[in-house]
Amino acid sequence: MPFQDYFQKKKAAFINRNNKSNADASALRDINDININFAAKSKNYVFPLTKLPDELMQEVFSHLPQPDRLQLCLVNKRLNKIATKLLYRRIYLNDSNVVKSDFMHLAINWTLLNLPSSLKEEESRDIANCKLKKLIETLQNNIHITEVIQWIRINWDLDSTLQRSILSILCNQGKSLQRLENVTDPACNDIISNGHFSRSNVSSFDMAPPNSLPEMVVPENYIPNLTKYLSQRISSRLSHMTLFIDPLKLFNYLYPLDIKLQIIDLKLHWRREFYNNDYFVKKIRPGNPLTKLSEVFDKRTLKILTIISWNDTLLKRETEMLKDFKEFENLEDLSLISIKQDVHILVDLFSSLTNLKRLKMDFLEEYVPEPTNPHIFLSILLACSKLQFIDLRYDGLIPQIINIQENKFQLNQQCNCTNCQIVFSDILKGKIFMFPEDYYIHDLQDIAAKDIFKMMKYLSLLPYSKACDAYPSVRTQPMNLTNFVTKMNRNLLEYRNSKSQLVPKIVNNPHQHSTVTSTSTAHMSEPEMIIIDDDDDDDEINAAIPPSSDDTAATISTDLELPHESLTKRDIIMCYHALIHHFKSIYVTFLKSFPHLRFLMLNDIPTIVMEENNERIFEPVFYHYDYKSNLYGWSKESNKNLENDSNNNNNNSDTIARIATVM
């Protein structure tokens, strides 16, 4: 090859390499410039929410609580339309205050009537009826709002005329209406069955009782009207049903059922009614009579069952129905309300219902709440491991913090954390059981003044809910944290006065009477400061109430006062948290036995399962106030105990049954 040709090739290769290098460098500079510009822009970057389609925006807004949805209505026309649809889609017509959680949003898909917490029952109901009137006016004046309502739940005690008015509007103009819940007025039957939209769209069937209370005179036209209503409404489209009569009686004597009902959600009320027996003499169903519930309801479709007993005993027919439900193995949600426990029947029932995901049990004995029998509890542990929601009463043979033995109070401490020690030393012993005679019981006044935990339940400090995660939690009587503290201080003051334990008031003493503190407490570290709401309705957390706060102190005279500081909101919250700590071993049993558990309402205290550091623990839903759990490390302790037991006795491995029995 001539040298000149060789040189030209080398020169061309060099130029190509150089051009490529320059191009790479230029590209790198461009990339760096882009990154710098993007970083600069990202500092002020806001996600363009308005660019989302309406369907996605509705999904985003569905996770907002009611006050935020109301604010969205004021932004612009587009957001107003989306938020309005969410606001009115599902309405809960309550007649008492709904309690909000200070820890999480609960049942936010319901729109509620905003009612104060401290009003008397009659006053609260009057305000609820006034708000219901305004809602009716809104629906009458705005057809677009009426057309988005899908589900409405009515409280029994609201004005019956107003109930009929709103149902008439919805049944005739609510083209989206699908479900009516808690319809208890028989006069509404014709409104629903003849409504322009409800007669074809509503998939729920609520049989209204003859009267608000059982064992009253049944109107003569009740059964004929019910028979007519059944003939108009019973169809294969029904998915939700509420009955006040035994289904076998209903469909053998009053309506000749010819197909199995594919009901998803069934609610049965068991109560005594004095119907005219003439209607239940001759069967009108052709062919063989219905003999068991699986001939009425399709076993494959029934998922939710609620039984509410109004009786103090289980009747023979009611026990037969419980046995019938053993066949419904696809049940996922079971609620047994105000029922007397029958251990053998219920143990047998739970052994068959292995697919349960939700369970609520409220047992009564002579109209007094009764803890779940250990045998029933054990059968649930063994058979229902898929449970995600549990609501029951169970003490696991652990005595209460304030226990009564014969005529004397006893204090039982299960948890020795710093806060629990302060509760026992500074609050229970320092304020409530300050003197030796305080431990003796003479009358009910002693319990009202000193058993703070019983009074939390008696005065309804904690709200009631059908299911705290799915339905609003309502107060069953006027009460909030401020009122509760005031009431307890008044009870304590009256008790101290009756025992001549009040002391002369010291004027201008900024410290008043210091709380009695044990020697051991003096060396303990200070508890975590609890931030407590000072608002009457306990809606917002906005103030720190110091332990010595006397904003709720009661007085009985200008010259005498308590020999100790008054109870404070902080005291009540600390006692409430100590109550949860007290049953640590039971909470651990639930965590061990139910790996899918999300909500637990144990002894009327609602808690939610949270995961921290790869460990599941319970946190209280109400009055959380930076609650400090005593469950941390339970899984490691459990594994260690299981290993030790296995090493000690290889032929006797630990089981859930043994754990429950020991507990």
UniProtKB/Swiss-Prot annotation:
Keyword Secreted: no
Domain of life: Eukaryota
Occurrences of domain F-box (ranges): 46-91
Disulfide links within the chain: none
GO cellular component: SCF ubiquitin ligase complex
Keyword Cytoplasm annotated: no
UniProtKB keywords: Ubl conjugation pathway
GO molecular function terms listed in the Swiss-Prot or TrEMBL record: protein-macromolecule adaptor activity
GO process terms (BP): protein ubiquitination; regulation of transcription by galactose; SCF-dependent proteasomal ubiquitin-dependent protein catabolic process; ubiquitin-dependent protein catabolic process
Job of this protein: Substrate recognition component of a SCF (SKP1-CUL1-F-box protein) E3 ubiquitin-protein ligase complex which mediates the ubiquitination and subsequent proteasomal degradation of target proteins. Probably recognizes and binds to phosphorylated target proteins.
Extra information: Present with 195 molecules/cell in log phase SD medium.
Protein name: F-box protein DAS1
Naturally occurring in which organism (per UniProt): Saccharomyces cerevisiae (strain ATCC 204508 / S288c) (Baker's yeast)
